[in-house]
Amino acid sequence: MKRTYLAVLALALTACGAPAAPAEDEFSLPTAAAYFTTACPEAGTKPATDKELTYWSMWTKDEPQGKVLRYAADCFTRKTGVKVTIQWLGRGYLRQNLLPALNTGTVPDLFDQDLTTVKAAIVSAGGTRALDDVLSLRTGDGTVRDVLPAAYRDTSAIKDDAGRLFAVPYIVMGNAWWYDRKKIPGFTAPTTMDELYALLGDRSVALDGDIGYYAAWYFDQLAARYVGPGGLARAAQDPTGRLWKSDPGFLKAAEHTARIATHLVDGWDAGKFPQIQQRWADGDAAYLFMGSWGPTETREYLAKQGGDQSIDYGSFQFPLPPGATHDVIEVQQIAFGVTAKAKHPEAAKAFIAYFLTRDLLAGMPAVADSLTPRSDLPVPSDLADLKAALEDPAKKHTLFMDGLDGVADGTFAEQVFYPANNDLLRGKLAPAAFVDRLATATAAFWKTQG
């Protein structure tokens, strides 16, 4: 997925419930080619009146995800008679197209995007309608509530301020430390920070430092383990800036982040994405902390290079640092929303339920190498370690960057957090000075917001 997270998506959840019960029959993923030749499943929910719907998508029609969604839309038409008109608008459309349209009569019925961006841009503007009733709709193999684990539907990340569901997910993204199993035989995941530092060795960590979102992940991951889900977002939204200093976890996280910075490859802040990520794929670095799209991007790069080089992807999570008590794992979801002014909300909701049918949603892992919220779908081998971590009941789900990147519609991260974090990684700020700067810059930022 490409990049600055939506800005990373435009450039590539605080509760964890038990996974949904698996389907009774064992299911194997089809090949990418076979997926598009499988029979369309029956629709568990058919609109009583709507005969059409308009869908604005964050994907392009030629992307694997777009191809899967187009196929599902065609199947939906065959099984329900509802015509689906799709506009393939790309990653930035939410703010460029949908947000300006909210005050007009020209809005789609259905749209999709990551939760952070939807909440910051569309929910905050009153542009969505509640989707709690979708949970009771039938997919082709159970209700939506049956097939979606609570971890992906019963969290603050996917609910508005009134506690209403504003979106329904169909793709799950995580992040992890990635390595090549072929190059590190007998690998054992670190269980302490000292073990992690020993593992990282000398200048072995790849980072495209020109992407502020990527560079922020080290501090973000560590801080979340000290202050818990919601802690980063609260500090970012504190108009006094004092929370950065009153909770000692932020300073401890900064100290570990500064130490990780000593393991970054030379030139990490001098390249242009994806140069450093490609160096990792070429074997110039041993480890890469990246989202679940990392294997797809690096595999595509190696394929374009030619030759027989390949990566046997393995991954692991950050260990708990000393004194930390929150064993978290970051999650982001791509989800469907229905606009408040939708002319065909019944059809839009029925399509959401239909796409969550196992045989249709299987296209996301089979064709697009993407994780889904359904626990009964097999996953690409590259993502098996990450999927296991996401489903570990001992881990608490938290939103990517705790949603900090969506604060003040993203301007807080761009103006305050990313610059300070980059200076911490470069050694221009000591950990204590970094926390001091966040405190003063946060207070100054909110004074300018009125």
What residue ranges belong to the model's regions?
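Hinge/lid segment of periplasmic solute-binding proteins
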Residues: 30-47, 118-174
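C-terminal capping/gating helix-and-loop segments adjacent to ligand/active sites or protein-protein/ligand interfaces
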Residues: 160, 330, 368-378, 388-446
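Extracytoplasmic "Venus flytrap"/periplasmic binding protein-like
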Residues: 71, 78-148, 185-188, 279, ...
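Bacterial signal peptide processing site
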Residues: 17-19
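Glycine-centered hinge/linker elements that transmit conformational signals in sensory
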Residues: 237-269
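Extracytoplasmic/periplasmic solute-binding protein
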Residues: 161-170, 175, 195-242, 249, ...
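Short, well-ordered beta-strand elements
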Residues: 49-61, 82-87, 110
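Extracytoplasmic/periplasmic substrate-recognition and gating elements
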Residues: 185, 262, 303-369, 448
